[in-house]
Design a protein with these regions (language model features):
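Bacterial Sec-dependent N-terminal signal peptides
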Residues: 1-30
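Central antiparallel beta-sheet cores of small beta-barrel/beta-sandwich binding domains
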Residues: 27-96, 130-132, 139-209
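Surface-exposed beta-loop interaction hotspot
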Residues: 116-149, 244-250, 256-258
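N-terminal "domain-start" segment that seeds a small globular fold
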Residues: 236-273
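Short active-site neighborhood of thiol/selenol oxidoreductases, capturing the structured segment around
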Residues: 270-294, 300
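Structural microenvironment flanking redox-active thiols in thiol-disulfide oxidoreductases
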Residues: 295-339, 350-358
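Structural micro-motif
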Residues: 339-343, 362-372
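Thiol-/selenol-based redox modules, centered on thioredoxin-like
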Residues: 367-414
């Protein structure tokens, strides 16, 4: 009897050890993830949709925001622990696999100045982004909306909402002076709007009430534990933002310019170097933490490949954290994931004053990205604030055409 008990105990220990080293599985198919953003005393749930695909023991996760598909290949499972490493940016999800269709953990955001953790959970075999019922929408808000953020406050600013609504489904974005809020997707139920975006840097939630066919009120925008703002909007098909080419200009007396910085391997770099001498050059003021900079870099990577043999160069001037080594790692990941072959430099710590110290020929600085176009003599021909990315649809297509036409014009000049 004692021998039998001892044998059973050994078998139990043996199978327990085997089980401890066994990877947990994830359910394939549609999932609904939720990031909880605590702002003051309020908990805001930011939902997003993703799918899971398994290839033996390897998983690929695809995050969906309207037309955007973000393929995440760095998915690590160890026992019942899951780590999802976002492409391009450094954000991560760390979770415990409670069951094949259930996760709980945290979303870790690595910002330009600080990092923070937010609670996260997810459920498999769920397709809906928002759980708010199927009440028939009272209004269709497709169109262009002049939007005031923090209305009536001293820090009030203007953005433009562009929405497409079909039944209860809504998608769109907001244009701003620094670019756009990328791909938003959500639901209209009754007189209420809910839209969100999670893309590896943004964790955005927009919600509001539709007062009537031309007025949106009681809007709340949440982006982080320290970012919550009110917004209202009126429908205006003629709404426009300030001209992005007139926001920042060049100080008098700067006929040609130069920059002198070190590359990521600490080698000196100047516009007088043979690589840049006599070439049309873009100076891209950016950050590896900036979603609009990602959209611009993805386009610039193609632009560079198409025109580099015709005397065209781009230099990414990255404003990051104080820590050079951490910044270098982030810049290199950003460059690698976007397959950009042009030069990226660490230009200093993020902040307006630091940008103006590095680039003293600018009259002002309004936001990332800011793009400086130089002709073959390295005279500044244009300073463009912001970048309207693919989430803006026709505005993105128009901007790409304008950039290509302007580059070709500069290349034709003697």
């Amino acid at each position: 009897m004692r021998i039998v008990k001892t044998g059973c105990l050994i078998l139990l220990i043996f199978f327990s050890v085997l089980n401890c080293g066994k990877k947990s599985k994830l359910l394939e198919g549609n999932w609904r993830g939720v990031i909880i953003i605590q702002t003051n005393s309020l908990k805001n749930e930011v939902p997003f949709s993703f799918s899971v695909l398994s290839n033996q023991d390897n998983y690929t996760i695809t995050i969906t925001n309207a037309e955007e598909k973000i393929e995440v290949k760095e998915v690590v499972i160890s026992n019942d622990s899951l780590i999802i490493k976002m492409p391009v940016f450094k954000d991560e999800i760390r979770a415990k696999i409670l069951s094949p269709d259930s996760l709980i953990g945290e979303y870790i955001h690595f910002g330009s100045r600080s990092n923070y953790n937010m609670p996260f959970y997810a459920k498999g075999n769920v397709k809906d982004r928002f759980f708010i019922g199927e009440e028939k929408p009272q209004y269709n808000i497709t169109g262009k909306w002049e939007t005031s953020v923090q209305p009536g406050e001293k820090d009030e600013y203007k953005i433009i909402g562009i929405f497409e609504q079909q039944g209860t489904y809504i998608k769109g974005t907001f244009l701003s002076t620094s670019g756009d809020f990328r791909f938003l997707e959500g639901t209209v139920s009754g007189n209420k709007i809910f839209m969100s975006c999670v893309d590896g840097s943004h964790t955005l939630l927009f919600k509001a009430d539709i007062k009537d066919s031309t007025t949106i009120e009681n809007g709340i925008l949440v982006g982080s534990p320290n970012w919550q703002e009110k917004w209202v909007a009126v429908k205006n098909p003629n709404a426009e933002l300030p001209n992005p080419e007139s926001e920042v200009t060049v100080r008098p007396g700067y006929h040609t310019i130069d920059i002198r910085l070190n590359d990521l391997n600490n080698n000196p770099l100047s516009l007088e170097d043979e690589r840049y001498k006599g070439k049309v050059t873009i100076l891209q003021v950016m950050g590896s933490w900036c979603p609009n900079c990602m959209d611009e870099t993805r386009f610039f990577a193609q632009l560079y490949d198409n025109y580099k043999d015709r005397g065209f160069e781009i230099i990414g001037l990255c404003f990051e954290s104080k820590d050079f080594l951490q910044s270098k790692q982030r810049i290199e990941k950003f460059k690698h994931d976007l397959q950009a072959k042009y030069e990226f430099l660490y230009a200093g710590e993020v902040g307006k004053n630091n940008v103006l110290t590095t680039l003293p020929f600018l009259t002002d600085f309004k936001g990332y990205p800011t793009t400086i176009y130089l002709d073959k003599k390295h005279s500044v021909r244009k300073v463009y604030t912001g970048f309207s990315g693919p989430g803006t649809g026709k505005y993105y297509d128009k901007l790409k055409s304008e950039i290509i036409n302007f580059i070709e014009k500069l290349l034709r000049e003697q």
